[in-house]
Amino acid sequence: MNSYDFNDADTQRKFAVIPAGTIATVRMTVRPGSAGEGGWLRRSNDGNSEALDCEFVVLNGPFAKRKFWSLFTVAGSTQGHAEAAKISAGMLRAILESGRGIKPVDKSDAAKEGRRIKSYGDLNGLTFVARIGVEPPQNGYEAKNRLDHVVTPDEKAWHPVTQEPAAAPSAAPAKPPSTPAKINRPDWSK
């Protein structure tokens, strides 16, 4: 039987939130949810809306490697979902503009093309400049970071970012088999 000794392990760490207003370069990862075209969207628990489930990793500065998350509603069955989808579309447009160096007022054909994607998977891995906010504690949960504002090229705080080559094509990863790998029963429990 294996033995694991954690007596010399560090005690757990508690992270404070990244201060509100922090400007940082972040990389967005879309966490596929097996809903919507290509499986990139996540369906809500009640099944009435679909959203992009996104993780943001800070790439530079004192908070490098720290993460925060956001859902972008893209479809739903209520007027509230429609309004949320409109807000999300504006934020996603700003993410494309920040990451691709497009000023929001640019109406050129190149700018219009830069705001188009073939799949939500095209957003996966996109790097852009963000202002990080803080959601106050609620419902027994501690305060957490959120994407407060996307900094676009028309703003003083914006700077060019380097996009890494896409790691995967514009399709969601294959869904894992529904049957998990067999876990062998330990000898002591027989």
Question: Each predicted region: which residue ranges?
Answer:
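Short beta-rich binding modules
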Residues: 1-190
